Every structure is written in C-alpha cells, then in structure tokens.
C-alpha cells in the first residue's frame, strides 16, 4: 500500500498531536508546515513546535551633544571652553581663560575654524542672519556676539553663558568654528565707534580655539 502524505499547517507556538500507526515513517518539517507520511508514526505520540520571534535590541539614542575648544595665542593667554546642548534647547558654554589683564574682554564666536594665520584667519563674527553687532540680549546681534568676560586680579576669567543662537547641530552648527578672546572690552555696538557695529571695537585677538565634538 502506497504511503499517503498529510500536510498540517500551524502557527507558533503550537503542538501537533500524532495518532499511533503501525507503519514506519519519517518526519519532515519546515517553517510553514509539517509533512508526515503514515510509516512508523506509532513511534511518535506528540511533537511540539515553537517558533521564537527574534529579540530586538533596545537602542537608546541621546540627543545631547558636547564640544570643546582649546584656546591658544601668541601671548600667555590660554583657556578651555566647553559647550553642551540637550535636544534642541540652548547651548551652555563654560569658559575658563587665564593670562588676561584684569577687567573685561570681548568674547566672540568667529565664522571659520581656520587658524593657519593665527586668530586673524578665523574671519569675522559668526553671523548667519546678516545682523549688525550687538549685545547677547539684543534682538539685532551676530549669533557669535557673546559679550564680555571679566578677568580677576589674577588674570583669570571664568563664566557660564547660555545662548540659543550657537547650536551644536543643524544648519547653523558652531562645530568647526572658533572662539576668540579679545584685547579690549566689547562696546556691544553702542560705543559710537566706526567699528562698534562690526566688532564692538574690542581690539586685537589674544587667543582662539576651534570647536570640536567630544564624547559625552
């Protein structure tokens, strides 16, 4: 008598019950079904099949960014500036610069991260909106206008700046641009000097550093 085949489809997990039989048989299976013939089924009382879905790794993506700039100059002025930003919020800038003369010094973000010719080659203030120079709180200002930092009697300036015009991501990202600390006080565009509306008449460039991303 020719063996007959039975095709049973199942979904996972499932249990296939096979009645006893006196005819020898082999068992063949695949993902979509099970093929049985009637030979030797008496050796199998039940077969359990379970298909386990592949587990997916949980990936947590952080939108936080962190960057740093190390400032160097031709004088003894040097410093470190760190930047952090969470999601699309404002950027927090922590500044520590040493070797300054006591008092206020203009502190700006410049357009280029090019220091091949010293701080001069960093270009003008970062100004994607084509505004005139102003104070950080002014509506009309360069994005790179960060005001003044004040050095103490030891020549050390430490401050924290929170600003929403210097993001670490997006089309106006400041990564790859440069911070510059200046010789003089920034007049914030209100000094009436011919340079007030471009540089704040903040004088020479003492030190600069290019912004680069760092691990969180």
Swiss-Prot record:
Cellular location(s): Plastid, Chloroplast
One Gene Ontology cellular component annotation held by this UniProt entry: thylakoid
Major subcellular location class: plastid
Enzyme class of the recorded protein, top EC level: oxidoreductase
Transit peptide start-stop: 1-62
Coiled coil spans: none
Cofactor binding note: Binds 1 copper ion per subunit.
EC number per UniProt: 1.15.1.1
Induction cue: Upon photosynthetically active radiation (PAR) (e.g. light fluence) increase and UV-B treatment. Accumulates in response to ozone fumigation, during recovery. Induced in response to oxidative stress, via a reduction of miR398-mediated silencing. Repressed by sucrose in a miR398-mediated silencing-dependent manner. Repressed by salt stress. Down-regulated by aconitase.
Tissue note: Expressed in leaves (at protein level). The spatial localization is regulated by miR398-mediated silencing. Mostly present in flowers, old rosette leaves and inflorescence, and, to a lower extent, in cauline leaves, stems and roots.
Cofactor dependency: Cu cation; Zn(2+)
Residues reported to bind Cu cation: 108, 110, 125, 182
Domain of life, per lineage: Eukaryota
UniProt record, GO biological process: cellular response to light intensity; cellular response to oxidative stress; cellular response to ozone; cellular response to salt stress; cellular response to sucrose stimulus; cellular response to UV-B; miRNA-mediated post-transcriptional gene silencing; response to copper ion
UniProt entry keywords in alphabetical sequence: Antioxidant, Chloroplast, Copper, Disulfide bond, Metal-binding, Oxidoreductase, Plastid, Transit peptide, Zinc
Pfam families reported in the protein's UniProt record: Sod_Cu (PF00080)
Annotated residues for binding of Zn(2+): 125, 133, 142, 145
The keyword Plastid appears for this protein: yes
Phenotype reported upon loss of the gene: Growth retardation (e.g. delayed flowering) and abnormal chloroplasts (e.g. less organized with fewer stacks). This phenotype is reversed under very low light conditions. Enhanced tolerance to oxidative stress.
One MF annotation (Gene Ontology) recorded for this entry: copper ion binding
Database matches in CDD domains: Cu-Zn_Superoxide_Dismutase
Subunit structure: Homotetramer.
Listed PANTHER family: SUPEROXIDE DISMUTASE CU-ZN -RELATED (PTHR10003)
Function comment: Destroys radicals which are normally produced within the cells and which are toxic to biological systems. Mediates tolerance to stress, including photo-oxidative stress.
Family: Belongs to the Cu-Zn superoxide dismutase family.
Name by which UniProt lists this protein: Superoxide dismutase [Cu-Zn] 2, chloroplastic
Species of the source: Arabidopsis thaliana (Mouse-ear cress)
Record lineage: Eukaryota, Viridiplantae, Streptophyta, Embryophyta, Tracheophyta
